Amino acid sequence: MALEIDAKNAAAAATGDGGAPGKAKAKENKSNSNSNNNNVPAAGEKNLVNGSSAATKKKGKKNRNKSPPQQDVSAAGAALSNGHAEKASVNGDAADANANVLDKKVEEEGATAAAGATEAAAEVGSSGDGGAATEGEAAASGEDVDLDALHDVGITVNISSPGADVLSVQLSSMELVQEIHQLLMDREETCHRTCFSLQLDNVTLDNFAELKTIEGLEQGSTIRVVEEPYTMREARIHVRHVRDLLKNLDPADAYNGIDCTSLTYLITITQGDLLDKKRTRPDSVDCTPPDYVIPGVREPPLLPLHPNIKNAKGPQALKVLTTSAWNPPPGPRKLHGDLMYLYVVTMEDKRFHISACSKGFYINQSTDECFNPKPDNPSHLSHSLIDLLSHISPSFRRAFQTIQKRRTMRHAFERVATPYQVYQWSAPQLEHTVDAIRAEDAFSSKLGYEEHIPGQTRDWNEELQTTRELPRKTLPERLLRERAIFKVHGDFVTAATRGAMAVIDGNVLAINPGEDPKMQMFIWNNIFFSLGFDVRDHYKELGGDHAAFVAPRYDLHGVRVYNAVDIEGLYTLGTVVIDYRGYRVTAQSIIPGILEREQEQSVVYGSIDFGKTVLSHPKYLELLRLAGKHLKILPHSVLNERDEPVELCSSVECKGIIGNDGRHYILDLLRTFPPDVNFLKLQDVQLSKELTDMGFPIEHRHKLCCLRQELLEAFIEDRYVTFIRIAAVHLQQLNAKKQAEKELPSITEKQEEPEKEQAEKSSAEQPEKEKEKEKDKEDEQKESKPSPTETKSAEAMVNAIREAQSNVAVSNEVQAAEVVKRACAAVGSLKEKEFDFRFNPDVFSPGIRHVDSPESGAQSLAKQKRLVQDAAEFLVLKQIPAFIKEHMAHSSPPIDGQSLTESLHSHGINVRYLGKVIKMLSQMPRMDYLHRIAILELIVRATKHIYYTYMQSTEPLHLSAAISHFLNCLLTTGPVNPAVSSEEVHKKQSRNNGGKHNKHNKSNKSGKPQSTSAAAATQNGHSSTAANGSANSAANTASTSGNSNYDWTLVTPRSLWQQIRKEIKSYWNWELDCDSIESACAKYGLLRISLLRAFCLKVGIQVLLREYNFESKHKPTFGDDDIVNVFPVVKHISPRATDAYNFYTTGQAKIQQGLLKEGYELISEALNLLNNVFGAMHQENGSCLRMLARLSYLLGDAQDALAIQQRAVIMSERVNGIDHPSTILEYTHLSLYSFANGHVGMSLKLLYRARYLLVLVCGEDHPEVALIDSNISLILHALGEYELSLRFIEHALKLNLKYFGNKAMHVAVSYHLMARIQSCMGDFRSALNNEKETYSIYKSQLGEKHDKTRESAECLRLLTHEAVALQRKMNDIYSNGKLTSDLPPIHITPPSMGSVLEMLNTINGILFVHISQKDIVKVRSQIEKHLKTSDESGPNDDNEVTAALKTFVAAINYNDTEQPKEGSEVEGATATQLTNGSEDSTTTVSS
């Protein structure tokens, strides 16, 4: 195995062709092994049917019988990764099948994690049985799927291992031999073997050969596992693998943020796999909710966030397993075959020294004091260390068997590594044990990979650029390319994060060590690192440190959009921005040759001094002009230092450098998009009265404010719709005028008649023209929805206008051109006769001298400026109101600051407008929850600015004390006593008072903006933050060298909240009307635990998992020991799977058309492609799983929905976080499907978990809480827990009344549920009153004849009857003065589970409309009769209706051929999914 891994790394280092240790390929290749092997599941695992349940397989059979080509595309998923692996092996990526082993650790770990990835990929890889798009659909969406090339053949082989039963495995013929290695290392019987070869007929198989290429391999062949001699390297791999097996259940790595491990608690909460559960009877369910879940909790506790942590670790097999101090073997022992020595302490407290030799492992006679390498007597040599330890320790043998059983019982998704590290903001106190391998990783392995790649470290730039150069013409090529890009990018992010932490921790030597620490730059592992400071006054005119701090983020945005455009021949740098310990670090790949020359010699395009000197280059103009068409960037000319015009197709700061490899690189993309004039005070710009009345322009602390790409797209779309409308109006007028002129000579008698005819003609033509307008509008919207690379070009827009002109029969081209000219002038087009909306990013840049070219038209520069101003005005006057209006329906309400920020960004609204958003929200009571979330986010962001400042002024010795003190000042009003003696503070301050401020001012004031050529190429905005003027002095004293002070000890709760108020006012222009945490909580309804969570995630703090008393008046809430860790906050660009995205969007379109089954198949294929690109574990995979689960449920397969949604929950917990908003949403969906499958108790537990997480994140006052409470109440009602049920529904009703109003359908349902519960409790009077409210709402909203209104009326009648009967009996009692013996008991009939499920579906936005077969036949006959009549009568004006009817008939006919299976929820039915606020909440109709 050593040779294979070394071969892989050598090839990767040599070529860079996707050869990086990666995440995906081991998962993908191995997934096909298991997905094709339904008869032989991995050890201890249940049989996974192609990533779905057996129900999915049945459904897949139907689809395959109907459409054979789909099966071939499904096979593509299995075949692709193996075919690519072979192709990659030629290109130097030979061992990608083993990439997962090397990716998450060094390869000595063995393949345990990769084998876990195998099963996970098998689970998700072909969910829905690979239902693919047909060839026609693929072609329609631009796919060029070569089904023949993706054809695959299965083969069954027997594997014979020493000491184990013969194993029969079904594999793909395109699998690599290496896949069998992975499979064996994951199985319980063979997992302890790492050093072995596979032989067929005594011939050793090449690990990187495909099975179909092996001579003599046929169905039923037996492959033997042969133990191989150890080398030093193989022995280390084996020891590391044993260590990983022993700590497999230990969550310590997930809490510590190591090796891309992360947490999931679903299986803990459900106490096992939901698919293995049996249906529960309602009377056997324990439904008592925890106290912290019942409505009315003031502050949710923290401990339930991590349930059952005491039992998570598993049994301990050994006390110590470490390398011996007798290492390395002396010369004489090397000649006897000794490789290394180990030291073991067993649970029986026996100590052993173990020798590793080429034959295996044995006990030697050494002690701690005496070296005696001879074998112990009696000697016992084992090829596996596990066998030896089992022989000498019975406790080890028992514990190891238990660990293995629990390991193999875990869900496959719990074992596979995530693509990026997910950090936990709270963690328990972890036991720190002896671990030599952990110590070796921390100190011996400096770069992580250099001892594994012969001759050199990884050339990140070469790998990143080579993967982008891979061919992309066919689907297999694109999948290979995207997988390679994703693998290398993931490794680069991991390495950059590790390097940035090492830089801040002081473990990397600077390339300019003699300069001020703020000015130092670093190169580590072929990555360039720069700190976030304005070191050379580079940003002096733009805001200094403030500008330098945000510049890397804007640069990252620029890299993202240029990567998305993906112009062949145009290259960007690998870029990652890391915030760690208060510092911002930018990590970038290095352009070849940049370190060998000066900056002036390197840059051939752009400017290095903000426009004083400007260069251009024909090749860059060609490439950037192509990119600019998609990004709406206007080519423009500026004057250089010699007053010569220079053409640019980007901002002037964008630099072009041709590397020694001949590639054309662009960097410094911080001004890719135009500036935001609302936050710039410019002399020659006058904003509109509406904006000035709102307080704009606001002078921001830096001048790099840019508009977002999403805003520009929305703005252009809005202007295009206006342009079409104006053009249509003018064309109508011309046409009407022309018609009137025609008719005028023939009319001589009546003067009124021409007017009448003209009016009639205009009105007759109006619908047709309106259709044209709507059609153009829909086309534009359709074009504007995809990525920026698919935005409609200006030429296409003009063609659409010309087509509209011809459709309305305007023959006079001169007049038509005049119409277009007027419309262009009205909307502000840059060209007089074309719709042209592009933006000049330099139009307001200071110091730039523009050339107002005559060919662009008169006043072109003024038009460009006006366009940028209009876009900024559009943001404030249209986009912000549209954002608020969209959330008024509460269809997908943000839950925390992160989801709020994402929603703002999707509308093109920058976070700096959050103050303005809050002002508008404050006037809307129904948006109270969003107002509160926005204020919380504002406080957290302002506090982050201040926190960074103080962290920079804190020396490492006092980090935990400083952080805990800061949290005390932020979240409490009790005593805050810094854990530093006052004597030490005064001593340090008096020592530092003299010269610390002067040192910062020793910056080199030379003309060059950078100190080295590396910096010239890469550093362009990496600076520290400063919270406000009063805080800046602390930042100026900070350095990474330890020249720190104790300013943080002077912070008090009062001073901190004063700084927060100032920061919010200066940055967001909003007044925070409170000066302490208590007043903030009282005024805005904030929860301290929510603020703690949000702040820790924002800045990277991990606190101890315990209950915190925030209102303690006697001792500080946080102590030094409560700060467990500090982790990095990483920003990077996530690569995209374009083909999978196309399949997904096509599937969504099918769903919106009501074709649920076709949509299901397309999204299943999207999931297969995502699994090929990203591996088994990724956020986008989770979105596909959620959609597939919902579709399965709508199609009547609740069991399949449960299986898929369970995987979606685990995936969301692992890749997003255990308390992420998406995870909460997944839990609520899973609870519904659990109930539908009869798991009533589990459904309640899942809802309790979702409610706890939701309240922890945002508090009880939220529309989503109302939804969850309604679900809980309904299920408790079904179980007879009426009092508990009433508490939840009362809270839900209160929230629904607040957020939806008195007449909303949500409120009607809540009143109805409350009436049902109260009637069961015998409170008929209250029930009657509540049902009256329901009836009133239904009557006003739906009318008296609606079914819901009639049902409510019938319910009122029954309740009235029961209430009268009960009152009559009570009156008898009162009149007689005593109880009568014949008073009948109140008969309470609990609702059936079917009726409860129906109501649950209604609450969650799912409505099943049942249609009998007789109804379908009747409807079909009526529609066909109508169609026949319309055909006989000739052309029908109502073409759309006719087409819709034909589609409906086809759908009914389709449904007749494929009826849902028995027991399904929808039998020959139409399933309508109403809006439910989730991503997949689209109104759909499926026959």
Curated annotation (Swiss-Prot):
| GO CC, alphabetical | cytosol
Under the heading Pfam families, the entry gives: CLU (PF13236), CLU_N (PF15044), eIF3_p135 (PF12807), GSKIP_dom (PF05303), TPR_10 (PF13374), TPR_12 (PF13424)
Q: Where is the composition biased (Basic residues)?
A: 56-65, 988-1005
Residues modified to Phosphoserine:
S284
Where is the segment annotated Disordered?
Answer: 1-94, 110-140, 739-794, 980-1040, 1456-1487
Family, as annotated: Belongs to the CLU family.
Q: What is this protein called?
A: Protein clueless
Q: Which organism is it from?
A: Drosophila mojavensis
What is the gene called? Answer: clu
